[in-house]
Structures are given as C-alpha cells and as structure tokens.
Design a protein with these regions (language model features):
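N-terminal signal-anchor transmembrane alpha helix
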Residues: 1-28
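Cytosolic, membrane-interface loops and tails of multi-pass inner-membrane proteins
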Residues: 22-54, 182-197
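Nucleotide and nucleotide-moiety/phosphate-recognizing core
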Residues: 4, 8-9, 54-60, 65-98, ...
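Short, non-helical or kinked segments that cap or interrupt transmembrane helices
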Residues: 31-40, 100-112, 139-147
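Membrane-embedded alpha-helical segments of multi-pass transporters/permeases
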Residues: 21, 70-71, 99, 135, ...
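Alpha-helical transmembrane segments of multi-pass membrane proteins
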Residues: 12-15, 90-94, 130-134, 155, ...
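Loop-to-transmembrane alpha-helix initiation sites
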Residues: 122-124, 140-147, 160-171
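Interfacial segments of multi-pass membrane proteins
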Residues: 47-50, 73-76, 93, 108-137, ...
Length: 197
C-alpha cells in the first residue's frame, strides 16, 4: 500500500463527490436541481430542467471528474490494481458524495470519463450501443443500461486486464442499482422518452 495510492484514492473520492449539476444549476439556473424534474443531479435532468447548455456543461464536468483522478493514478501509481481502486472510489464519490450527504447521481458520465482513460478504444463501442438503443427506443436510461451491461463484455473480448473487467462489472451493477426507478418505469411504460424531454 503506497502513500501515493492512498492520496490518489482520497483525491478520487473527493473529485467524484463534486456535484457538478447542483453547482451549475445554482450558479446559472438559480434552482436546486434536486428539487426539480426527476430530482437527479446528472446531465439528463439538468438538460430537461435548465436547457441544453447547462446540460452539456454538467456532462463535461461529470466526465472530467472521472478522467482527472484516473489519469493521475495512471501517471503516479502505474499499478493496474491501484488505478482500478482509484477509478472505483471516484465512481463511488459521484454516487455517494460527501458534499450532498451521500445522495448523488447515477454514475454514467463519470464512468465514461474513467473508461476514456483506462480503455479508450472500447468507449466508442459503448457510445454506439448507447446511441443505437436510445434512438431506437427513445429512452436515455435504456441506452445507459445497455452500454453499462456491454462494457464488461467489450473489455473481456478485447483482452483487457481482469481487474478492469471486474471494475466494469462492479460499476455496471451499481449503475443498474441507481437506475432501479428507471427500470420500474420502463416496465410500467411510464419512463420519460427523449422526445418528451
């Protein structure tokens, strides 16, 4: 256990905990995004409530929360296990942020940032999967769930280290857990479609 690894892990959690959507909504939208729309702090809800601009900024911010600490881990730690630990804790920071009493987002954008660093060649496949499903069935949540489910398969087939495959499995399970309300609405036929956003 290295000092660098411990510091990177703490920094990753704090980075993941930064509530991008909440901050942007309060700065430019004068609203608490947690009290609007679906109540989620992520880019989709910010887009629906406050428009494309703030939605896009929230997406970028949440992706960067995943990129920066994992890139630092790759540079300073180098060890695949430490990189995976930092990545997972960063992801947990978004889901359970200390700054919001551990009530965070669903993790898709931050997961995207993480995999842009550790498996950049697999990200286009995940994005294509997301787009095809989301456009076909008109549900952002279904696209996100599909991409999350397929990422471990992509990594495994491409021969990535097992620690990264396991990381993607763990993150995927948590993404499904955080989308349990969406899954319920999808089954009931009451999930909000893209065209209605």
């Amino acid at each position: 256990m290295s000092v660098e690894g411990i510091l990177l892990t703490i920094g990753g959690y704090l980075s993941g905990s930064i509530p991008t959507g909440v901050i942007l909504a309060k700065l430019f939208g004068t609203k608490d995004i947690r009290q609007e729309g679906s109540g989620n702090i992520g880019a989709t809800n910010v887009y629906r409530v406050l428009g494309k601009g703030l939605g896009a900024l929230t997406l970028v911010g949440d992706v960067l929360k995943g990129i920066i600490p994992v890139m630092l881990a790759c540079t300073l730690a180098g060890d695949e296990l430490w990189i995976a630990v930092v990545a997972f804790v960063t992801f947990l920071g978004h889901l359970f942020p200390v700054f919001l009493r551990f009530r965070g987002g669903k993790g898709v954008a931050t997961a995207l940032g993480i995999f842009l660093v550790i498996a950049p060649l697999m990200v286009p496949l995940a994005i294509i999967s997301f787009v095809l499903v989301a456009m076909k069935w008109r549900y952002v949540s279904l696209g996100s769930l599909t991409a999350s489910a397929l990422m471990p398969i992509f990594l495994c087939v491409a021969g990535y280290p097992i620690v990264y495959v396991n990381l993607s499995l763990a993150m995927g399970c948590l993404i499904f857990y955080r989308h349990r309300g969406n899954i319920k609405r999808l089954r009931e036929g009451s999930e909000k479609e893209i065209s209605k956003a």
